[in-house]
């Protein structure tokens, strides 16, 4: 009986420390390759730099998920935590106008309110936090 209780407590502790399997993001930019790599993220970096300065935001964090394919494809998933509702709307508006112009090597696409499930990602894909 004692071993059963200890085993159940141990299993309960282990399950409490597991990573969430899916996360919902309000904004996800997918950098995809057509043949020769992914688009340059310099225009995005510049837009984020200006946005931070305009709204006096100290840090804007995103999750970089990848590699998603053989040619360096990856996702940038923005949680938009710490922004006001107005800032979120303006950020999405700026992203919507910027992303279609990012076509130098591949293509960048924007998806909103997307849930990313860890089980659906390639086995070699990792998630890292990127601060702008």
Show where each model-derived region lies:
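C-terminal partner/receptor-binding element of secreted or periplasmic proteins
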Residues: 93-132
